[in-house]
């Protein structure tokens, strides 16, 4: 059921108030404070269409909770009635809320929870859910972003939400659409990331703000964030469910009291992806991939229903592989998800916020793929390769010539926003303190680039010959023979990667080389072999014929009368 669109079309303007005061004092800080106070006062007068929407939203959530309570008492996991209510909430969440936001609150906050509380009978659970949307909108759209108080209030609201879900005597009587559950975990980590960077920028903060931060070190503390994510994983028993699911068993058999319910199951799964993201932001790439050890990335599953979750998973796994020098795996991961985005892009354009997020990560992954392919050339899907040449052809050529500035530029654009888990010393914070986590990761990356600076040139020479005296090739490169031998050893070492071949864990693998050239040295001669595999068009056509035959059989079965 969609909230009636004609009710959006009223002529009410929430900003058009007649008032006999002047908002400009000449002092920017006073003006900003006065303006915010003014906005909060005006929202006490809530448009009728917003009142009606909130009452309808509350009734839908309340009806679902009542039905869930009944089914929990009857020892049922779910029903068609619950599914229908979840579908209605999804429509409100993805369509009605977005339309009303665009019309009434494009760059300003929704009414505060206290203002709408009488409309919903002070329903505590609904107000927690409403605040989650309220603060998320402030972070995303409101000019100037959240105040320090709003950052704290949003944290406490997430604490209330997760306490309600995790600390109940039994499963909480609540179900939400998968998209909203993913957005809750995604936003929770984003706000932690935002606060971690915010608290490090002390130059423009007042003494009062700094003292407030100093006296509240546990707010948005990394341990509390990790604790929430691990608690959701443990409560849902999701790792055991995934283990059984990937081995062909029934995950319900090991789900337990909580994990049988969609709320816990999906929050548990999304929390695994959240842990992947959080460990990547902290620079712990091994642990980032390890948390996904029961998720088989190379297969579709019943859990991969939210496109943004899929894209985020592949982005962070690919980036972690890149930083671990597992270039072949990074290239495979990026190429797979970019192909997926390319083929399903039209479905993301239905909602703007999804499209913006996926489009940004799509561009970032193209940049990371350009880096990986420059450092480890190998064959990828032709359509992705064509896109890459169009976007980064010139930059890839400059990177092949060892231009460290281009590497740094692309890394800066495409990497995640790293953060430090440590609360800063507020008595001595230098202006660039918030950049230190990024600069540390950049240094690690550029050190690796520097080690490989000569490899692209060596590779281009090796492709031209089958045998060549070591001294002669060293002369071509203007290198002393001993230094050239060291570079050849570096080439051998860097072109051999740990590569995932089979199994569930993304950390497993075998040492392989996918380099288009290989060589060995016999005394003072280099013997070179071109290992480039010619395109096998026959295999492609055979696969397409098999797919066509399977499709034909399926269509025939569908056309047969029962």
Curated annotation (Swiss-Prot):
This is Eukaryotic translation initiation factor 3 subunit L. Component of the eukaryotic translation initiation factor 3 (eIF-3) complex, which is composed of 13 subunits: eif3a, eif3b, eif3c, eif3d, eif3e, eif3f, eif3g, eif3h, eif3i, eif3j, eif3k, eif3l and eif3m. It comes from the Eukaryota. It is found in: Cytoplasm. Pfam families: Paf67. GO terms for biological process: formation of cytoplasmic translation initiation complex; translational initiation. GO terms for cellular component: eukaryotic 43S preinitiation complex; eukaryotic 48S preinitiation complex; eukaryotic translation initiation factor 3 complex. Its main location: cytoplasm. One of its GO terms (molecular function) is translation initiation factor activity. Component of the eukaryotic translation initiation factor 3 (eIF-3) complex, which is involved in protein synthesis of a specialized repertoire of mRNAs and, together with other initiation factors, stimulates binding of mRNA and methionyl-tRNAi to the 40S ribosome. The eIF-3 complex specifically targets and initiates translation of a subset of mRNAs involved in cell proliferation. InterPro entries: eIF3l, PCI_dom, TPR-like_helical_dom_sf. Belongs to the eIF-3 subunit L family. Residues 329-535 form the PCI domain. Keywords: Cytoplasm, Initiation factor, Protein biosynthesis.
